[in-house]
A protein has these predicted regions:
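Short glycine-enriched, charge-decorated loop/helix-capping segments at active-site entrances
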Residues: 137-143, 181-185
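Active-site-proximal loop->helix
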Residues: 176-180
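Short alpha-helix boundary/capping segments
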Residues: 16-22
């Protein structure tokens, strides 16, 4: 079976971290001594041809978190690139499934069962064609809404009662498949780059304050 290699930019750490960063990294190592209590699942398709596509919003959010915190996320486990991190004061398994979008649930279900993590502690960041470009929507449960990645996660968790952070990519003017695997324009990417931190903030808020608080703060 083909085992994908992690993208090279995810395997490298920034040079010369500051003293404050070193202290924070030590704290994060201490926090990571226990098993993860949450999954943060960032959806996308692996491969360079998908890097700037609408379906890869989740991967973009993960990469933003990796870059901001000087992290690694290159351990291939549960058919996903993974790393246990401190996020929202909890031990969280960051996941970038490498199954392709439509089989994302295989990776998520396997990790959730292994760590005995309940569905309401599985947070998924994904694209949403029903939302205008750059608009966020936090939901605590619900149908897949035509998103095959979410549909597969629902099937493998056996429930739709898991929180998700949806990032709008706009409605297609043509075939949906071509739209979601199509690249952002330069102007669209600027909008998306501006919303990734908010998507991560919404996910963190779910952990610290609950879904309702995240909805009140980030939906709109």
């Amino acid at each position: 079976a083909h085992v994908p290699h992690p993208p090279s930019h995810l395997c490298e750490k920034a040079s010369a971290p500051s003293r404050a960063q070193k202290v924070r990294n030590i704290f994060m190592i201490f926090k990571k001594s226990g098993p993860p209590e949450w999954l943060l699942v960032c959806l996308g398709n692996y491969g360079k041809q998908y890097e700037n596509t609408r379906h890869n919003i989740g991967f973009m959010a993960a990469e933003r978190l990796i870059d901001k915190r000087d992290l690694r996320c290159n351990r291939l486990r549960f058919r996903a690139l993974t790393e246990v991190i401190e996020f929202g004061g909890a031990n969280v398994l960051l996941m970038m499934p490498q199954t392709y979008m439509n089989l994302s649930g295989e990776a998520v279900g396997e990790a959730a069962r292994f760590y005995k993590i309940p569905a309401d502690h599985v947070i998924v960041i994904s694209d949403d064609i029903s939302l205008p470009l750059g608009k966020l929507r936090v939901r605590g449960s619900g149908s897949a809404g035509g998103h095959n990645g979410l549909k597969n996660i629902i099937a493998h968790l056996g429930t739709d009662a898991f929180p998700r952070v949806k990032v709008g990519v706009g409605a297609p003017e043509h075939d949906i498949v071509d739209w979601v695997i199509g690249p952002f324009t330069a102007n669209e990417r600027k909008v998306i780059d501006g919303v990734l931190d908010r998507a991560l903030g919404a996910a963190e808020c779910i952990i610290t304050d609950g879904v309702s608080a995240a909805q009140n703060r980030y939906n709109g």
